[in-house]
């Protein structure tokens, strides 16, 4: 499994759903994730919660799936934490060049909560942007759309 770093930005919106809390956050992911072959529905487990930082609560977690792992950093409210499993759906990818001429890939994905050991189910709909697009190509973009 490859490892990537995902950084969640501060633009976090949350609302309650029948499964718990739905959190909408944009985040950035390295190009390694593009090389993985995604399935339409894939389970991930988020664990290894480590509080960090002084502004709000910054947490790190490990995102584990069949195809790849990610170390996630997020600044969230103190009660939004715990080990839980999500399905990932609706992955789309678009290649583009940023204002500095760097090749990037924008991804969108929907995470649906399955369970939470801390009693808080969290689902996320995220905007992902590749911040390190080494090795990224139209081919890998197509495979990520899968």
Model-derived regions: residue spans:
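OB-fold/S1-family single-stranded nucleic acid-binding modules
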Residues: 82, 87-137
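Acidic, gly/ser/pro-rich intrinsically disordered tails
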Residues: 1-6, 12-21, 115-146
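OB-fold ssDNA-binding interfaces and closely related basic DNA-contact patches used
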Residues: 1-60, 69-76, 85, 98-102, ...
């Amino acid at each position: 499994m490859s490892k990537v770093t995902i950084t969640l930005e501060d633009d976090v919106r949350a609302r309650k759903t029948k499964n718990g809390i739905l959190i909408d956050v944009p985040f950035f992911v390295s190009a390694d994730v593009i090389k993985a072959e995604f399935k339409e529905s894939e389970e991930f487990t988020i664990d290894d919660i480590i509080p960090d930082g002084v502004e709000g609560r910054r947490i790190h977690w490990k995102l584990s799936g069949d195809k790849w792992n990610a170390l996630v950093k997020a600044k969230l409210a103190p009660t939004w934490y715990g080990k839980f499993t999500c399905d990932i759906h609706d992955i789309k990818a678009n290649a583009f060049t940023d204002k500095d001429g760097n090749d990037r890939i924008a991804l969108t994905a929907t995470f649906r909560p399955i369970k939470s050991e801390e009693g808080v189910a969290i689902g996320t709909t995220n905007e992902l942007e590749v911040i390190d697009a080494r090795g990224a190509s139209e081919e890998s973009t197509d495979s990520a759309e899968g």
